[in-house]
């Protein structure tokens, strides 16, 4: 209930609640964290996911707050009005809704997250675990006494790279990740 309580505090004190939806927008749900958690922000910003990687960012918000951008706030864009990215956004949102991509990301990501943790459990590995949400999870390491957590992460990255898996510590699922990709990663 953290976000709900935060919303209440911001409303009570006249503070704008701003969501950075760069990672959550169009991944947790088409409506981002606001839809997923049922909490409406006063302002929210989104990035390239809305346009499937094309250069586009979006600032959304309450009408009264957005009206301030017309006169009282200096606001500048790099690609403002660039039509290709806008067309990509429309097409992307259509596909996200039609194919329920956020649910697919959650399902595939859960397979990876739970698969990783099952391997750790099967081999009694206690110094690492996968946490987070299906669409974006992360592997955490504890120091083992022999090496630091960062060194352990580096060793794992090095070994995964030998098998053609580029991993930065996060799993950012995308619509093209198949069951075969997940099995290959967990192998």
PLM region spans:
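Conserved N-terminal phosphate-binding loop of PLP-dependent enzymes in the Aspartate aminotransferase
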Residues: 1-187
